[in-house]
Design a protein with these regions (language model features):
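Short, basic/polar, glycine-containing "phosphate-handling" surface segments that engage DNA
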Residues: 1-41, 104-114, 118-143, 148-254
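Acidic-basic catalytic patches of nuclease active cores, encompassing PD-(D/E)XK
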Residues: 41-80
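Generic, well-ordered alpha-helical scaffold segments in large soluble proteins
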Residues: 58-62, 102, 121
Length: 254
């Protein structure tokens, strides 16, 4: 489900903004997405390397439309695995984000716009890790990669490293640098227990259907990446703020 209790953009606002687009979200597309989510939830347990490859293909390529070097034309390459981030490894050495997203187009020196950190289902995203040279939580590790990618930029570049995406391959969190770590978009494929909400992305309700639509939409290439300027998701956040200010002004003008 989409949990917006700590989100920088609300589910209600997204429902209003995407109403027409959601009407065009056919039952066939929803059924295909639901099959993919169920297939992932029921997958055999793989070693870390194989799991990351399958995870990247299932979600980043097949669901969200990013292109990798092996299967996409040069101009459509938006995904680099093991992206180097100087100064953000254990002990202050060179680190590597599990995945970086951006309009790379075959250039490894292009600015990444999303830095991703993957963990397995046994990891707690906010828990300190027992790693040699660093005890940072997965969330801290991910945001450190974003910070490292921003280091040395002058804020006048066409794009910036805007986002951090951290996941245990069941829970997904998208952090916007300006509001991290307190605010983030959060989805879970499967609830941990009955106390974790009334439904999840595998449920058959209308609320679950809309959340599946949001899951496919919000993390997509079209929402998170930009050729120049702020990406569409950030422009939606700004629109939500503007609407809130307008409503507040109307309230005080009464």
């Amino acid at each position: 489900m989409f949990d917006d209790r700590r989100s920088f953009i609300t589910r209600a606002f997204l429902r209003a903004e995407f109403e027409l687009d959601y009407r065009a979200f056919t039952d066939e597309r929803d059924a295909e997405l639901l099959r993919r989510l169920r297939g992932w939830d029921e997958r055999p347990r793989l070693n870390e390397t194989l799991a990351e490859r399958a995870f990247t293909q299932t979600f980043f390529v097949d669901t969200w439309g990013y292109g990798d070097a092996g299967r996409s034309p040069r101009e459509e390459r938006t995904l680099i695995a093991r992206f180097p981030v100087p100064g953000e490894g254990a002990g202050g050495g060179a680190g590597a984000a599990d995945l970086a997203l951006g309009w790379f187009r075959g250039r490894t020196n292009a600015i990444p716009q999303v830095l991703c950190e993957f963990k397995d289902i046994r990891s707690k995203l906010d828990a300190k890790q027992n790693r040699k040279g660093s005890t940072r939580s997965p969330v801290e590790q991910c945001l450190n990669y974003v910070r490292g990618a921003r280091r040395g930029l002058f804020a006048n570049e066409p794009v910036q490293p805007w986002w951090g995406l951290v996941t245990d391959m069941n829970e997904f969190r998208l952090y916007w640098w300006d509001r991290a770590p307190t605010e983030y978009i959060r989805f879970s494929i499967k609830r941990e227990d009955l106390l974790s909400g009334e439904y999840d992305l595998l449920s058959g309700s209308e609320d679950a259907r809309f959340d599946r639509y949001l899951f496919a939409k919000l993390f997509s290439r079209e929402m998170l990446l930009s050729d120049a300027g702020r990406p569409l998701l950030l422009r939606l956040v700004e629109r939500q703020w503007a609407r809130g200010r307008k409503l507040e002004g109307e309230f005080y003008d009464r």
